[in-house]
Design a protein with these regions (language model features):
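Metal-cofactor-dependent catalytic cores
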Residues: 1-152
């Protein structure tokens, strides 16, 4: 039986080094990114970044503090689904949006600033997923996330 996850948080960063702003809904623009996010229109392979809530919890446990989604600089937080299993796979968010997982979302050096000393190394292997938008639409908190079975 396929896993079905749930979207629990959305964040948009208007400028490159600015703090992510929490949203309840966002428009996913086909081939471009999330409306209002600074990555919109840049690399199609990294249009959207996702992380699992469980990984945020693990990182926080190792560092001895609560980690907010803004600290990791990822756009979407999900629970109930293994994001890494979605690499090179198409998956839906809600009833409209289709993404394709493009790879691991590796941590950047800003994790040392955002999470504190050791933050970069703790995030290694827990950074989440990068994806591109194949079909746009509205994404909202509570949307279901699931693999689209291949037709092969």
């Amino acid at each position: 039986m396929p896993q079905v996850g749930t979207l629990t948080w959305i964040g948009i960063r208007g400028k490159k080094k600015s703090t992510l702003e929490t949203q309840t809904t966002v428009q996913a623009l086909e081939g471009k990114g999330l409306e209002g996010d600074h990555y919109k229109g840049k690399s199609g392979k990294r249009s959207v970044t996702l992380i699992q809530q469980g990984h945020l919890n693990n990182v926080g446990e190792i560092l001895g503090k609560k980690i907010s989604p803004q600290d990791t600089r990822r756009n979407l937080v999900v629970e109930g689904i293994n994001l890494i299993a979605l690499i090179d796979q198409e998956f839906s968010i809600g009833k409209e949006v289709i993404l394709k997982g493009t790879g691991h979302c590796h941590p950047c050096s800003r994790m040392e600033t955002n999470l504190g000393p050791g933050g970069y190394n703790v995030m290694r292997g827990h950074g989440g997923l990068t994806a591109r938008i194949l079909r746009g639409g509205t994404i909202k908190i509570g949307d279901k996330i699931q693999l689209i079975p291949s037709k092969a």
